[in-house]
Structures are given as C-alpha cells and as structure tokens.
C-alpha cells in the first residue's frame, strides 16, 4: 500500500487531488446556506489576522489561502499523513476486509479512527470545551466525521490499491478543514460547523460517504 500505482490511474488521481477540495468548498457553501446569518461578508476574522501578520488585504489573503488549498493542499502534509494512513487504510482496513465485507470494514475503520481522537477532543481540540454535552457530543461529532472521511479515503484505497490517495485526502483536510471559520462571525457552534468536522459543515462529506458505501457493496475482501 506504499506504492502509489500511478500507471493507468491518472484520472482517478485527478479526482483524488481535486475532488475533496471541491467538496470542502461545497461544505462551506452548504453551511452558510443553512446559517446565512453567520456569514461574515466583512471578513472580520481575516482582518484581525492580516493586521497582526501581513500587509495583505483580507480578500487577498483569502484568495491566496484558497489557491494554496487547491494547488498544494493534497501534498503539503503528505509525509505525516502517509505514515498515519499506512496504519489505518494500509493495514487495519485490509485486515478487517479479510473477516467482514468491504462496506463494514470502511465503517469500522472510521469508527476506530474517530475513537482514536478521543483524548484530544476531551482536551478541547476541534470543538473546545464550553459546549452543551461536553465532551460526548464532541466525541460523537468526531466519530461521525472520521467515518465520513474514512469511507472516502478507504474507497480511494480500494480502487487504487494504495494508501497514497488516502494520505493526499488527509493532507488536504489537515491543511484546510478550518478554512470556512475565516468566513464566519464569532457566534458559531463548532459542533455544527462551519468547519467540515462539524455535523452540518461535514454533511456533504457524509452524503458522499453514504453514496460510496452503496457503491462498494458487499464485495470480496481486499487482498493484502
């Protein structure tokens, strides 16, 4: 699963490279469609960032951030994410596929991945500590997000017989998951969004994951 298997799979890799990024933008648009009052057209958050760190205007910084996500998001964190994905998608998922269906393996791997985040969620990473239902709602939200993202990454792993595409998707998410927050006013609930690890912000990822689970069906186990 360390080999990228580029030969004959360039079109699939283009989908892996750009598809999740487009899904990220769709997720942000979806969130602000549901909560239009939280959209900050004045880019207040970015204004505070630019005043402290750069001479760029907020709109220029936003444009640069978006272009960075599109162009280098899938590879900027590829080394650490590949190390992690070799464990999740390169080892655990194929092992599970030897005893359960591919569909079940994708979901179980995602659940375990989500539970693995439990300590940092309790520490307040991603969702903070001041929300109703702390820390259980945060844990459940993270598990839901990890299942959604894990199914997408796992499906790419099955199709390309490599953990590299999963690492690329993971890299993009690490580089850009919180990007929609820069477009939001300060009264949002991180359990809901606007970042993609929120329940509403991540709904497009969940819908794609459900579609992929339907596609993968109960097929023979992946050969390790």
Residue locations for each model-derived region?
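Specific transmembrane helices
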Residues: 1-81, 178-224
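Hydrophobic alpha-helical membrane-insertion segments
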Residues: 14-31, 109-112, 152-159, 163-170
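Transmembrane alpha-helix/helix-exit interface in multi-pass inner-membrane proteins
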Residues: 25-37, 84-85, 106-126
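Membrane-interface interhelical connector segments
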Residues: 46-53, 87, 92, 121-134
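Residue-level hotspots within the lipid-embedded alpha helices of multi-pass solute transporters
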Residues: 69, 77-82, 114, 142-146
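Membrane-interface helix/loop boundary segments of multi-pass membrane proteins
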Residues: 82-115, 154, 158-162
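Membrane-interfacial alpha-helical segments at the cytosolic side of multi-pass membrane proteins
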Residues: 92-100, 125-128, 179-184
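Functionally important transmembrane alpha-helices
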Residues: 103, 107, 130-192
């Amino acid at each position: 699963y360390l080999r990228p298997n580029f030969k004959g799979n360039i079109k699939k890799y283009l989908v892996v490279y750009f598809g999740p990024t487009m899904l990220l933008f769709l997720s942000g648009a979806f969130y602000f469609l549901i909560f239009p009052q939280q959209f900050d057209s004045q880019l207040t958050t970015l204004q505070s960032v630019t005043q402290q760190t750069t001479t760029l205007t907020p709109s220029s910084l936003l444009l640069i951030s978006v272009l960075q996500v599109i162009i280098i998001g899938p590879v900027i964190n590829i080394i650490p994410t590949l190390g992690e994905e070799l464990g999740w998608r390169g080892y655990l998922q194929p092992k599970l596929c030897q005893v359960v269906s591919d569909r079940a393996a994708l979901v179980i791997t995602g659940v375990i991945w989500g539970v693995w985040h439990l300590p940092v969620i309790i520490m307040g990473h991603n969702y903070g500590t001041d929300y109703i239902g702390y820390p259980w709602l945060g844990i459940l939200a993270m598990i839901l997000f990890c299942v959604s993202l894990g199914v997408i990454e796992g499906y790419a792993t099955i199709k390309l017989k490599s953990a590299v595409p999963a690492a690329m998707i993971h890299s993009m998410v690490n580089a850009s998951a919180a990007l929609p927050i820069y477009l939001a006013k300060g009264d949002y609930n991180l359990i809901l969004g606007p970042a993609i690890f929120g329940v509403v912000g991540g709904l497009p990822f969940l819908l794609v994951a459900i579609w992929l689970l339907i596609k993968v069906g109960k097929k023979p186990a992946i050969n390790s």
